[in-house]
């Protein structure tokens, strides 16, 4: 048996856009993502699936059913977000002292008068409904992490189709410092309205995915799909500023911890000669971001500077982890190799002979230990595993995946890392962004026609873990690689 500390919590994470819609009156058409997945050109190009989020699992209307199942599973922690566009569907007056010509946003003035002014523009029906959802969550004894941003931006801040076509004269999302100002105001306002129900805050989920896939990995089908290294750097610079200003805004109304949730891969060398490639990949993909919001070190243009207004803007780290990335040293740097990690054939085996998921992601649980211990050794900030899961409709691999990754969290804790919870992705199947409904990550299977939720076998395994606070002897055999032979037929 592998027992966890009594204070450790098992739970789940989910996102508004992916889960909320699907019942009458739940539609939220005022976001960049909604416009993006409905765009006929995106569909024709195969950038998006053609599945529509308004046909989703229906959490907005059926949240009590979701919470009932979580309670039966013995879960004790949840991470949800408020959809910005539901609260402010229409443009707000420009912030005071806003100067778009300034690249650096070192302060966003937020006071009670400003919050009251924002309150006049807020959608009270949406606010009240979120309060009902969060109150129901808390009434079941769940610890609650409220995340401010899980990818969709209000349309009045980002028109992704215009940007995709090269028109930057309209709302341009994270390319504009206006979005930095507005995100700080939004985050402070949400904390002001919901602080009585919240235990901890996160500013953002996976900002590196937004800046990376939106402007570099444009085949992924993420908005705005405009290929430009320069614009990717600008977006990430503004996202870092937005996190820091949101941190300040939340802290102006709350004393509770504020973290950020980041997409992580475990970088592994192809051979022993490729360790330098691992260090380079970690710096490029992880440390540069956290050094900015913890140490204030950031690159502006070609110059590395220290900004005190960015320093120390983090209380905890949310670790999202699914698989690894194998890297190889080259003359000019390094390359990521296909056939491993995210770059595998679906429902097959990787070049290492490890099984792959419906998404083509390699089974590699030891990478979670690698990521957790490296964060701890570098920053000594406490952590949650805020996403970990697998696209596996048949639920063949998920029981193995679940137990094997929870075991790696146990290893990390025993090695000294301060990890306080494991939040699986996700409780139920949901809308997997550009891939639509084809990728099913849920412990609960969703019938999208009836909205009924069914328990997969892995949900029973997770209940065993959560209710005992341990990987019990009865399920310890699942801490292993799933047999791969059936996947070859």
UniProtKB/Swiss-Prot annotation:
Keywords assigned: Glycosidase, Hydrolase, Methylation
Pfam families tied to this protein: Glyco_hydro_1 (PF00232)
EC number: 3.2.1.23
Database matches in Gene3D superfamilies: Glycosidases (3.20.20.80)
Catalytic activity: Hydrolysis of terminal non-reducing beta-D-galactose residues in beta-D-galactosides
Key word Hydrolase present: yes
UniProt feature coiled coil, ranges: none
Example GO molecular function: beta-glucosidase activity
Quaternary data: Homotetramer.
Family to which the UniProt record says this protein belongs: Belongs to the glycosyl hydrolase 1 family.
Name the UniProt record assigns to this protein: Beta-galactosidase
Organism: Saccharolobus solfataricus (strain ATCC 35092 / DSM 1617 / JCM 11322 / P2)
